[in-house]
Regions:
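Short amphipathic alpha-helix with an adjacent loop that forms part of the alpha/beta core around
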Residues: 14-19, 91-92, 111-120
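Solvent-exposed loop/turn segments at secondary-structure junctions
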Residues: 31-34, 60-64, 89-91, 105-108, ...
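Active-site-proximal beta-strand elements of phosphoester/diester hydrolases
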Residues: 1-2, 97-106, 126-130
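Short loop/edge segments at beta-strand edges and connector loops
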Residues: 58, 85-87, 129
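Conserved beta-sheet core of the metallophosphoesterase superfamily
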Residues: 132-180
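Short, Asp-centered acidic motifs that coordinate Mg2+ and/or phosphate
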Residues: 24, 55, 81-82, 98, ...
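Beta-strand-turn-beta hairpins that frame and shape the catalytic cleft
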Residues: 81-82, 88-101, 120-124, 180
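Membrane-embedded segments
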Residues: 1-82
Length: 180
């Protein structure tokens, strides 16, 4: 919520998400820029929650907003949104278990991978992190199957035919796409 206000655009986004009938919704931070937007943010997340369980991590702008993590956590709990700040939750899928791991923003050096559970049979481990520099911290023993990140905005600014010339700190050259 860049301007901190919930509006018709957010209703349209919520409607489009609900129409997709997702099983889960994952958001990797940069939810908020100004503290005045906090109630509007959770109104939006609650609308998304009508479609599917919502799992959220924090990004650099969430911290820059000045809102304490405890305030995010209290509102997330109240609205049944799963806020993961260096934490893991487990979801039964009927074919096994999904471990959803969320770390605090790696670009601000707040990520702690000690929350990644050990490898287990019939478990798929998904890591949610705001910045792609989390890839520099992940090791083979972490047994993570998929990492979802944001922060790079797909290259921030791009001119057709010219390689990306600026990325936010914390991307470490990763613009968009798949990295192994």
């Amino acid at each position: 919520l860049d301007r901190g206000v919930y509006g018709p655009r957010h209703e349209r986004i919520g409607g489009a998400v609900r129409a997709l009938q997702p099983d889960w919704i994952f958001i990797t931070g940069d939810l908020l820029n100004v503290p005045e937007g906090l109630p509007h943010l959770f109104r939006f997340l609650a609308r998304l929650r009508e479609a599917a369980p919502v799992f959220v991590t924090l990004g650099n702008h969430d911290h820059y907003s000045g809102v304490p993590v405890a305030d995010y956590a209290e509102l997330a709990d109240r609205h049944k949104i799963t806020l993961l700040v260096n934490q893991s939750v487990f979801v039964s899928t009927g074919r096994g278990e999904l471990a959803i791991v969320g770390v605090d923003d790696p670009s601000l050096h707040r990520a702690d991978l000690h929350c990644v559970p050990p490898q287990a049979d019939h478990r798929f481990t998904l890591l949610l992190a705001h910045a792609p520099n989390i890839l520099d911290q992940v090791k083979a023993h972490h047994a993570i199957d998929l990492i979802l990140c944001g922060h790079s905005h797909g290259g921030q600014w791009q001119v057709p035919g010219i390689p990306t010339f600026w990325l936010p700190p914390g991307c470490n050259g990763r613009v968009a796409g798949r990295y192994e």
